[in-house]
Amino acid sequence: VQMFTDEKGIQSVKLRVSDTDQSSYNPTVIGAHTLWEEYPPKIAEDEIKTVAETGEIVLSRVVIPETIVVHYGAPSDPTAIDYYVPYKDYIKNVASNEIYSTWPDASLRANILAIMSFTLNRVYTEWYRGKGYDFTITSSTAYDQKWIYNKTIYKNISRIVDEQFANYLSRPGVTQPIFTQYCDGKRVTCPNWMTQWGSKHLADQGLSAIEILRYYYGDSIYINSVETIAGIPSSYPGYDLSIGATGDKVRQLQEQVNRIAQNYPSIPTVAADGIYGPATADAVRRFQQIFDLPVTGITDYSTWYKVSQIYVGVTKIAENI
């Protein structure tokens, strides 16, 4: 487990049922962070892909995928394993590998936005599938971003991803997410790209995330949001739900929380009446406690999409039983 001072690390562990009485020991070695290990530098690409480059396979709109298929090696390595990773988990893993969780909030947000836009460009352009490969992205820093199997995730990075996971970076008149390349800025220099250490120093000086991004990528860069998130039953209503809120979105939330409560019985069930009262707030609070969200009883952006994610998960499990 990789830890930093004063930062909470979250280590995912998969428990498997053993068919024998004998215990087994199968350690997983987590690879080193990109800022202290020497990995191959990124091979430069155009930040906006042409149709000819992508093999003429391009999505009609920007979509947050349910799953990223990560090829655990160079694109041409046929022995590399392909891992199927939920989109947000992929972004959290890459960010935990590429930047330090101890950095200022603005630098974390700027880097995470660049990581997401980089990833969604690969998704939107079908970059590797257009070249005959059956995956979304690689784990090689020479071609893409560093993803490490079973990497420790840091709580503040996880929170920021939850808050802005539907965003990406755009330029006027360009549909595709900008392919925002970056480097560390110390061992490797990269003109017109963001440098990770440089973003940290700019945040120390008080610059915001968008100011940092424009410093490196130019004044025309702006933050955009997707309209479609794959696998999510209904989009965020555009405002927080709290005591006094009413309507179909509240009813949908109540129904989903009640379904989740079947698998997590410490969550109290509530009347699905479309009225956000104290009982609904209590159920949301318990949900937030279980899934490591800020415990407010208010259904904000992060809570809404976490409820949707868990709801989809438990209903899929039930279908497969």
List PLM regions with ranges.
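Conserved, single-site charged/polar hotspot
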Residues: 1-321
